[in-house]
């Protein structure tokens, strides 16, 4: 089962991972891409994750399904923990991308606009 607040939290984590720009391999390399879908007719949420970036004809590495009023499917805690870890890895990968391609700090926000996700230690490197 999933509350509305928990659904919003999962959506926020997907935005933290994706940013709000288009995300596909040709633009952002291997930064993860998330897909978040709510199906009102069955009252469930599905989250697909392309861990190495989205590209045509490539299936997601992870697919989650959570029902708002049922007890089957994936658990909120399990999906949240996975997305939180992916969010941290995305922050580190975005910084590595910036370092490898000698992109200035302002350009980094295009790759990953949620800089508050990155810890101060990562920015000091």
Language model feature labels by segment:
Residues 50:
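An extracellular/secretory-lumen and virion-surface interaction module
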Residues 1-44, 53-125:
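Negatively charged, low-complexity tracts enriched in Asp/Glu with abundant Ser/Thr
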């Amino acid at each position: 089962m999933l509350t509305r607040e928990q659904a919003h939290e999962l959506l926020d984590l997907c935005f933290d991972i994706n940013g709000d720009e288009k995300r596909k391999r040709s633009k952002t390399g291997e930064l993860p891409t998330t897909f978040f879908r709510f199906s009102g007719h069955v009252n469930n949420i599905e989250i697909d994750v392309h861990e190495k970036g989205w590209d045509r004809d490539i299936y997601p590495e992870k697919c989650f399904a959570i029902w708002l009023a049922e007890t089957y499917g994936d658990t909120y805690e399990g999906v949240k923990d996975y997305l939180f870890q992916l969010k941290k890895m995305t922050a580190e990968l975005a910084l590595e991308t910036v370092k490898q391609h000698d992109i200035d700090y302002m350009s980094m926000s295009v790759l990953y606009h949620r800089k508050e996700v990155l810890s101060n230690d990562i920015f000091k490197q």
